[in-house]
């Protein structure tokens, strides 16, 4: 039919082994056509960067809601995040959903309320932990019914602290 037989296809994989299906790679390797190298370096799933200490932490993604209102600045912990989402909440104000998988921050915040969009934003990350500070009753219901682990300041114990040098509500931090 198109002039390319099975040999032409296998020749392509011999020249481009990374494109070969696993079974073909194994067969090509066993006849010496592919040189096996060292195992790949573990990479952080959210960034594609090398994992710290050569190992991806075995834990769920941690998402923290962080305020972006001018009175809340400067925020803490954003530069250590693997991913930072900015979402419009109301009246031109935005909030961040800050994600950590391979990295940590000693302090993140100011932590603010959850929004109904948060479960949809986080759906791609398995069953993440969402750290937040309250929300409207319908929002809290949506968050509690979502496939995530919700933790607010009433359930988070020592993970949440208030900074007395900052005015409320811009003074709640997660660690």
Give the predicted meaning of each segment.
Residues 3-25:
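Hydrophobic single-pass membrane-insertion segments
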Residues 20-83, 90-175:
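A surface/extracellular/periplasmic glyco- and lipid-processing/surface-interacting theme
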């Amino acid at each position: 039919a198109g002039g390319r037989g099975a040999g032409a296809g296998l020749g392509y994989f011999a020249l481009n082994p990374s494109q070969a299906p696993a079974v073909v790679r194994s067969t090509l390797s066993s006849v010496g056509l592919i040189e096996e190298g060292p195992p790949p370096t573990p990479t952080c799933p959210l960034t594609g960067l090398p994992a710290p200490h050569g190992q991806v932490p075995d834990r769920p993604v941690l998402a923290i809601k962080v305020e972006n209102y001018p009175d809340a600045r400067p925020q803490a912990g954003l530069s250590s995040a693997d991913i930072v989402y900015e979402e419009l909440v109301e009246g031109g104000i935005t909030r961040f959903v800050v994600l950590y998988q391979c990295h940590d921050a000693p302090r993140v915040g100011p932590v603010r309320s959850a929004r109904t969009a948060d479960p949809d934003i986080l759906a791609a990350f398995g069953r993440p932990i969402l750290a937040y500070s309250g929300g409207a009753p319908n929002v809290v219901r949506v968050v509690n019914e979502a496939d995530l682990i919700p933790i607010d300041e009433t359930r988070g114990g020592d993970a949440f602290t208030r900074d007395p040098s900052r005015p409320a509500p811009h003074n709640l931090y997660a660690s």
